[in-house]
UniProtKB/Swiss-Prot annotation:
Keywords: Ribonucleoprotein, Ribosomal protein, RNA-binding, rRNA-binding. This is Large ribosomal subunit protein uL6. This protein binds to the 23S rRNA, and is important in its secondary structure. It is located near the subunit interface in the base of the L7/L12 stalk, and near the tRNA binding site of the peptidyltransferase center. Transmembrane segments: none annotated. Belongs to the universal ribosomal protein uL6 family. PROSITE patterns: RIBOSOMAL_L6_1 (PS00525). It holds the Pfam family Ribosomal_L6. GO terms for biological process: cytoplasmic translation. Part of the 50S ribosomal subunit. GO terms for cellular component: cytosolic large ribosomal subunit. PANTHER family: 60S/50S RIBOSOMAL PROTEIN L6/L9 (PTHR11655), LARGE RIBOSOMAL SUBUNIT PROTEIN UL6M (PTHR11655:SF14).
Amino acid sequence: MSRVGKLPVAIPNGVTVTVTPDNVVTVKGPKGELAKAMSNKINIAVEDNSVVVTRDNDHKDVRALHGLTRALINNMVTGVNEGYVKTLELVGVGYRAQLQGKKLVLSLGFSHPVEMEAVSGVEFEVEGGTKVKVKGIDKELVGAVAADIRKWRKPEPYKGKGIKYENEVIRRKEGKTGKK
């Protein structure tokens, strides 16, 4: 049995989980509502303040889906209850971020500013011009938007300049020594 899959997902107060016969899981909470279609090879049941995920057989693909389905449901419950935040830091001379309405404008050393529209379900917050917070209830979407922002200037190993996650550690390299 899957170590992750056999644990029930606790449903906190204020959160409701419904499962349709074709395995569409809908989670409603104080921050919003998420719905996701799960595989029909997995059985999902809501039993007194918890969601229990089980499987019928032990085929390799079904075993893999067991833990995945439980983790996805857990992420949905956490998202509608608390939400998710990814913080990015801009490191470099002249690297700045600012908000124009719902649009994030980044100055990253290009000849033009980089503009990113907020996808529905995600909002941006800028702290001090060098920290960008990506907030939302869908963990996958928050991570994808944060990765798209980071993609514009990945941190380089010599000076550490670029866009990095808040807790990310950049492996540094020594530069050339040169002749003397």
